[in-house]
Amino acid sequence: MPVTVRVRRVGHRGPPLDLPRYESAGAAGLDLRADEPFTLAPGERRVVPTGLALELPPGHEGQVRPRSGLAARHGVGMVNAPGTIDADYRGEVGVILVNHGQAPVAFARGDRIAQLVIAPVVRAELELVDALTDSDRGAGGFGSTGQ
């Protein structure tokens, strides 16, 4: 069932860009676009403005995820993937990109740089205990389930 996300344009770096949209009927993420042109040198990271501020419904978050095509073709990804937009954040959405490739990558204003997935949030109540219930896995981590 769709939820309403209120959007405000911020930054005013040029003519308004299209609002994020789903590019196919089955897409999970809305495409976020760069609100200014830039070039990422190899090894460089940068916070890229989107020109948008969001008002997410209570009980939801925005997950900013990398675009697989940028990673596959250019080695460009996100430093903190996924990035989290809390429901009470009202500032401009920025995307932290990094160039893991060996060549500079140029972006034009309006290029798609990330995906925004809106998801419900479950809030946990923590209970301090002296022991945890046993499980088959136990404390094995960092690849232990594939051995």
Swiss-Prot record:
Pathway the protein contributes to: Pyrimidine metabolism; dUMP biosynthesis; dUMP from dCTP (dUTP route): step 2/2
Biological role: This enzyme is involved in nucleotide metabolism: it produces dUMP, the immediate precursor of thymidine nucleotides and it decreases the intracellular concentration of dUTP so that uracil cannot be incorporated into DNA.
Molecular function in Gene Ontology: dUTP diphosphatase activity; magnesium ion binding
Positions annotated to bind substrate: R67, S68, G69, N80, T84, I85, D86
Name listed for the protein in its UniProt record: Deoxyuridine 5'-triphosphate nucleotidohydrolase
Residues annotated as transmembrane: none
Keywords linked to the UniProt accession: Hydrolase, Magnesium, Metal-binding, Nucleotide metabolism
GO BP: dUMP biosynthetic process; dUTP catabolic process
The protein's Enzyme Commission number: 3.6.1.23
Enzyme class at the top of the EC tree: hydrolase
Family matches, as InterPro entries: dUTPase (IPR008181), dUTPase-like (IPR029054), dUTPase-like_sf (IPR036157), dUTPase_trimeric (IPR033704)
Family: Belongs to the dUTPase family.
Reactions that this protein is recorded to catalyse: dUTP + H2O = dUMP + diphosphate + H(+)
Species annotation: Anaeromyxobacter dehalogenans (strain 2CP-C)
Cofactor field: Mg(2+)
HAMAP family named in the record: dUTPase_bact
